[in-house]
């Protein structure tokens, strides 16, 4: 401890603290600093290492020097939250290389596991030095727990299964682009900070008040983030949209979510409120939704005050500049190679809608998950076949494990089986993996049965 304290003071490190919401108890910390090319030797005290990092980084380097967090609650990963914040801040500050070199002993097993899941690699012969390339990160949005209905979403067995699957998924993603950073963003954290940003822009309290006083602006979520949610002291109205793919996945279009009016009618309803609008989405990178909505918003004369998103990339900022829209975000990443939303990788839990004349099971839309054996992932040409296979396998196995626990807990709670026809009682907006128009699902069977079959089909393709 004294070595850590002395090192932090001598190196003039920055310290990021994590405190509990009740009482402000300290839950963890990370110490770090930024290094320019000329500062590498002074921090590393190794000429060969400093030169190698200098050639690889070609810019600012993030140096993490110590980290520790409370691990008493296995369902609360405090260390992950801290590491995410440090890495995200470093990326927004244009750091393109990351190092972990602790003061004192090599990292504990928990921290070593965490570093591995972020894409850090241990330098050969030096267990106290870990490196990661931050120039083209992959982002994983952790949101699976937000897809489960109440009260099952608070079940400890289910949350533990979700966490196990999440950690396996992180590890699998590091193999797509070895040596490169995998940044995990919590949907819960994004949700809370978006609420704070919306109420701040609307100049109203971030918590409900007894005498309700509405702000001048209205909040309009147009993606999956905040869909169906109410923002404190703010008029909130969702534009219900859905990205729908053709059966061969060659085309996609923005359409109203099933059972909702046409998008233009929804926007006219927004216009009728006669308020400036705060548009809200989870991600602004390819900008598919905003590209489709922008012409209609302009045609109807909707006054857009600002666009708020959870994650904004450099490409997304350029798109907003081109459209002349002000934009702000919870996280800003100048460079983004690939992004994944956790729930869309889990069959029956999420995915993208497929255009079909009828639903395979009443209450379930036909969907596609961009993993094997359902589809060829868009990144397949850039990654090894083994990495793509292992990612698909992890997604199927984790989905099976999570849904199996969900089925058990549903039966214990309600005294009946969780079949496909009852899946909407346990999962918010579930999808059924599309099998074409000739194969039918049995609505009386469980989703885990079909996941076992799909896993067998995947294993047949692997030699």
Describe the predicted segments one by one.
Residues 1, 17, 32-36, 45-48, ...:
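PRPP-associated nucleotide enzymes
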Residues 7, 14, 24-25, 91, ...:
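Catalytic cores of nucleotide-enabled group-transfer and carboxylate-activating enzymes in metabolic
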Residues 2-23, 31, 37:
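Active-site rim helix/loop that mediates acceptor-substrate recognition in acyltransferases
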Residues 35-37, 71-72:
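Short coil/turn motifs at secondary-structure junctions
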């Amino acid at each position: 401890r004294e070595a850590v304290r002395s090192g932090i003071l001598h190196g003039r490190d920055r310290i990021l603290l994590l405190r509990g919401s009740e009482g402000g108890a300290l839950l963890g910390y990370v110490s770090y600093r930024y290094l320019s090319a000329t500062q590498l030797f002074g921090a590393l005290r190794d000429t060969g290492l400093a030169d190698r990092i200098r050639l690889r980084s070609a810019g600012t380097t993030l140096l993490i020097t110590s980290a520790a967090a409370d691990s008493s609650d296995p369902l609360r990963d405090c260390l992950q939250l801290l590491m995410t914040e440090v890495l995200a801040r470093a990326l927004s500050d244009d750091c393109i290389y990351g190092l972990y070199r602790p003061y004192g002993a090599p990292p504990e097993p928990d921290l070593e596991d965490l570093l591995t899941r972020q894409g850090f690699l241990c330098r050969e012969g030096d267990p106290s030095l870990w490196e990661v390339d931050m120039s083209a990160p992959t982002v994983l949005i952790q949101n699976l727990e937000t897809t489960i209905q109440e009260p099952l979403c608070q079940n400890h067995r289910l949350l533990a299964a979700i966490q196990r699957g999440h950690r396996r998924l992180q590890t699998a993603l590091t193999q797509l682009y070895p040596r490169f950073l995998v940044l995990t963003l919590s949907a819960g954290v994004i949700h809370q900070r978006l609420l704070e940003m919306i109420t701040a822009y609307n100049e109203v309290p971030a918590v409900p008040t007894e005498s309700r006083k509405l702000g001048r602006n209205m909040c309009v979520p147009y993606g999956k983030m905040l869909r169906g949610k109410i923002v404190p002291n703010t008029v909130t109205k969702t534009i219900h949209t859905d990205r729908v793919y053709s059966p061969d996945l060659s085309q996609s279009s923005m359409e109203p979510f099933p059972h909702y009016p046409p998008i233009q009618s929804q926007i006219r309803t927004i216009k009728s409120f006669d308020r400036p609008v705060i548009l809200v989405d989870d991600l602004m990178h390819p900008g598919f939704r905003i590209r489709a909505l922008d012409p209609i918003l302009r045609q109807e004369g909707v006054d857009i005050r600002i666009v708020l998103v959870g994650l904004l990339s450099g490409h997304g900022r350029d798109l907003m500049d081109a459209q002349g829209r002000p934009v702000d975000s919870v996280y800003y990443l100048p460079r983004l190679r690939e992004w994944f939303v956790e729930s869309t990788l889990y069959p029956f839990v999420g995915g993208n809608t497929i255009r079909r004349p009828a639903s395979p099971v009443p209450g379930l839309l036909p969907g596609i998950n961009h993993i094997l054996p359902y589809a060829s992932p868009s990144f397949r040409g850039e990654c090894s076949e083994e990495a793509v296979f292992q990612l698909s396998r992890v997604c199927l196995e984790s989905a099976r494990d999570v849904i199996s626990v969900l089925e058990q807990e549903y039966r214990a709670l309600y005294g009946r089986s969780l079949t496909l026809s009852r899946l909407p009682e346990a999962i918010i907006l579930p999808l059924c993996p599309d099998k074409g128009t000739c194969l039918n699902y049995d609505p009386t069977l469980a989703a885990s049965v079909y996941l076992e079959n799909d896993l067998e089909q995947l294993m047949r393709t692997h030699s």
